[in-house]
């Protein structure tokens, strides 16, 4: 479920040494399965462990995960990275905002997952997002842009050179993508 690097385990062990005896860590997701999902790590004293928690035993510590967060922390990684500027703890949870779908799931679900997990995080840097409205019988993914993408002069390039290429590469059964958005240029538009 969660991989914690040796460096991160050593970092946590050092922090836990200053806590009450038996204290471990808890890894959790707030608002799991939503675009606002946020992951976190906190101390978990022995009296805070719930019967429904999953205990993940590592060499230097135990990480507890609550029942609701568990599916969203699948494939999560915690690392402790040191560079010229200092060191920091990183937590990558690719499924926090949306549960990973099975390879044999319907095309609509697989495309939606790709949009939410791969494409929207890139568009979010410009305050934008894209939603899958439908997949036509002819095999076209009909998309709607929102936020900073609505009315942006670069939306055609983003659609054809970015999103379409990525989706066609990942889903050969698609014929292409089409934009359903009625673009309204305004202050919200990125370019």
From Swiss-Prot:
One of its GO terms (biological process) is iron-sulfur cluster assembly. The keyword Manganese does not apply. Binds 1 [4Fe-4S] cluster per subunit. The cluster is presumably bound at the interface of two monomers. Pfam families: Fe-S_biosyn, NifU. Its cofactor is [4Fe-4S] cluster. It comes from the Bacteria. SUPFAM superfamilies: Fe-S cluster assembly (FSCA) domain-like, HesB-like domain. [4Fe-4S] cluster binds at residues 149, 152. Signal peptide: none annotated. Keywords: 4Fe-4S, Iron, Iron-sulfur, Metal-binding. InterPro entries: Fe/S_biogenesis_protein_NfuA, FeS_biogenesis, FSCA_dom_sf, HesB-like_dom_sf, NIF_FeS_clus_asmbl_NifU_C. Gene3D superfamilies: Fe-S cluster assembly (FSCA), HesB-like domain. The keyword Cell membrane does not apply. GO terms for molecular function: 4 iron, 4 sulfur cluster binding; iron ion binding. HAMAP family: Fe_S_biogen_NfuA. Homodimer. Involved in iron-sulfur cluster biogenesis. Binds a 4Fe-4S cluster, can transfer this cluster to apoproteins, and thereby intervenes in the maturation of Fe/S proteins. Could also act as a scaffold/chaperone for damaged Fe/S proteins. Belongs to the NfuA family. This is Fe/S biogenesis protein NfuA. It comes from Salmonella typhi. The gene is nfuA.
């Amino acid at each position: 479920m969660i991989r914690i690097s040796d460096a991160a385990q050593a970092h946590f062990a050092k922090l836990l040494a200053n806590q009450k005896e038996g204290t471990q860590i808890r890894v959790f997701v707030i608002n799991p399965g939503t675009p606002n999902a946020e992951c976190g790590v906190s101390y978990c004293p022995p009296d805070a462990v719930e019967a429904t928690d999953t205990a993940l035993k590592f060499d230097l510590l135990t990480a507890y995960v609550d029942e609701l967060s568990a599916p969203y922390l699948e494939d999560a990684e915690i690392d402790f990275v040191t560079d010229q500027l200092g060191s920091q703890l990183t937590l990558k949870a690719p499924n926090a905002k949306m549960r990973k779908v099975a390879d044999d799931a319907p095309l609509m679900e697989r495309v939606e997952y790709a949009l939410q997990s791969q494409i929207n995080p890139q568009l979010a840097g410009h305050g934008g997002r894209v939603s899958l409205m439908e997949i036509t019988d002819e095999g076209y993914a009909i998309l709607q842009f929102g936020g900073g993408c609505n009315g942006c002069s670069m939306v055609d390039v983003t659609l054809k050179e970015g999103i379409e290429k990525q989706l066609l590469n990942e889903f050969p059964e698609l014929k292409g993508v089409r934009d359903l958005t009625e673009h309204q240029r305004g202050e919200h538009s990125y370019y």
